[in-house]
């Protein structure tokens, strides 16, 4: 489809902010507060194209997937092409929303991509040994407590994490 060959309707919607329920006093992007906005974008004047501007560092993987699925469902149902545009940031869950497009556009300075998961901990093993503290952890299964700051970390543990 050549989008410049005839008069067509194009709707634009912006998805900005952290993805997920942020609590009582802050609004994040959730399926509940995005659904009607997206439905209107895909139905008002029967657009051939919906442009979705995204500016999000990500957030909830569940909400990211629900919003992604809603965009794809509406695009297929209404036979509408989707162009996603990364503004400043489309990272993590924002990147997932970005991938809902048939065409993806990003500025060369936009931060785009799956930034992954970070897990940090401290190691206190030598300290508790020096203090004579005995620690007991009960788990079922192999290495369930591998992030315990009072245990040594093995290469196997690190590989399991990443």
Walk through the language-model features, giving the residues of each:
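Small-residue-centered hinge/linker elements
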Residues: 1-80, 89-162
């Amino acid at each position: 489809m050549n989008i410049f060959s005839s008069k067509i309707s194009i709707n634009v919607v912006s998805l900005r902010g952290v993805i997920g329920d942020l609590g009582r006093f802050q609004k994040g992007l959730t399926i509940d507060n995005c659904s009607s906005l997206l439905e209107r974008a895909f139905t008002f004047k029967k657009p051939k194209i919906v442009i979705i501007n995204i500016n999000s560092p990500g957030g909830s993987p569940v909400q990211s997937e629900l919003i992604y699925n809603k965009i794809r469902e509406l695009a297929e149902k209404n036979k509408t092409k989707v162009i996603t545009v990364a503004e400043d940031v489309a990272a993590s869950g924002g990147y997932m929303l970005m991938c809902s497009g048939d065409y993806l556009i990003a500025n060369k300075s936009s931060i785009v991509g799956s930034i992954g998961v970070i897990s940090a901990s401290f190691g206190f093993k030598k300290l508790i040994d020096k203090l004579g503290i005995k620690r007991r952890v009960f788990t079922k299964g192999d290495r369930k407590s591998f992030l315990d700051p009072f245990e040594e970390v093995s290469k196997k543990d690190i590989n399991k994490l990443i």
